């Protein structure tokens, strides 16, 4: 099972020679090569992007990838309707607060996390199990933050997009949709809104306690 997947380091893909070595060590002539969607991705301990930009070509390619990705996202945002943009603002606000208020907790969990091998589907299965057992907003906001952090540290953009697409479907269940639409609705009573905000963020405390038990729950 996946252990502490939502923390730590760079995901790297299995090199072709790794697969070839595995095949050569297997006496069975019917060896089946892994399908691309089932490829195993490994966390590496390095989080310094300079470790992956060793040549001038690496730097130039990264610049091109950044430009294309930024243009795509900027264009996407311009096309979003007003309602969707308001949801973007809400998610920005709440996830940023989770990141800021519980930064030390995240660092502790990153230190606790061990190097593991897994697929995007392993990640999705673990997240789905956690969300089925926790109906609160906090756990969903924190999951978004964790998956986003994985994406930041992933050197495989194709796998990152796949992970974001799959996990967004899993995270956006009926509970999360109800929470976001409730928060976005106008409130006549500012005090009520503040209390609701604090109540919702308080759930994040329980959420972190849940995640901290994962290393004991998931073998």
UniProtKB/Swiss-Prot annotation:
It is found in: Host mitochondrion outer membrane; Host cytoplasm. The keyword Membrane applies. Its main location: host cell. The keyword Glycoprotein does not apply. InterPro entries: Bcl-2-like_sf, Orthopox_F1, Poxvirus_F1/C10. Signal peptide: none annotated. Induction: Expressed in the early phase of the viral replicative cycle. Keywords: Early protein, Host cytoplasm, Host membrane, Host mitochondrion, Host mitochondrion outer membrane, Membrane. One of its GO terms (cellular component) is membrane. GO terms for biological process: regulation of apoptotic process; symbiont-mediated suppression of host apoptosis. Belongs to the orthopoxvirus OPG045 family. Homodimer. Interacts with host pro-apoptotic protein BCL2L11 (via BH3 domain). Interacts with host NLRP1. Interacts with host BAK. Plays a role in evading host innate immune response by inhibiting host inflammasome activation. Interacts with and inhibits NLR-mediated interleukin-1 beta/IL1B production in infected cells. At the host mitochondria outer membrane, interacts with the BH3 domain of host BAK and prevents BAK from binding active BAX. In turn, host apoptosis is inhibited. This is Apoptosis regulator OPG045. It comes from Monkeypox virus. The lineage of its organism: Viruses, Varidnaviria, Bamfordvirae, Nucleocytoviricota, Pokkesviricetes. The gene is OPG045.
């Amino acid at each position: 099972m996946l252990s502490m997947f939502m923390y730590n380091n760079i995901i790297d893909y299995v090199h072709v020679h790794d697969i070839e070595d595995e095949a050569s060590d297997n006496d069975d002539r019917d060896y089946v090569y892994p399908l691309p969607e089932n490829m195993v991705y490994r966390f590496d301990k390095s989080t310094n992007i300079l470790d992956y930009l060793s040549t001038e070509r690496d730097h130039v390619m990264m610049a091109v990838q950044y430009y294309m990705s930024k243009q795509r996202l900027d264009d996407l945002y311009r096309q979003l309707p007003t309602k969707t943009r308001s949801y973007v603002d809400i998610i920005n606000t709440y996830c940023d607060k989770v990141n800021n208020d519980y930064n030390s907790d995240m660092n502790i969990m990153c230190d606790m996390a061990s190097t593991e091998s897994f697929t995007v589907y392993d990640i999705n299965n673990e997240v789905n199990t956690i969300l089925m057992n926790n109906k609160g907003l906090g756990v969903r906001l924190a999951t978004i933050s964790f998956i986003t952090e994985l994406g930041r540290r992933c050197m495989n953009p194709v796998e990152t997009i796949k992970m974001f697409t799959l996990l967004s479907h899993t995270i956006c269940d009926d509970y999360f949709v109800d929470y976001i639409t409730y928060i976005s609705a106008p409130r006549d009573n500012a005090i009520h809104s503040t209390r609701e905000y604090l109540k919702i963020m308080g759930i994040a405390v329980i959420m972190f306690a849940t995640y901290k038990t994962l290393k004991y729950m998931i073998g």
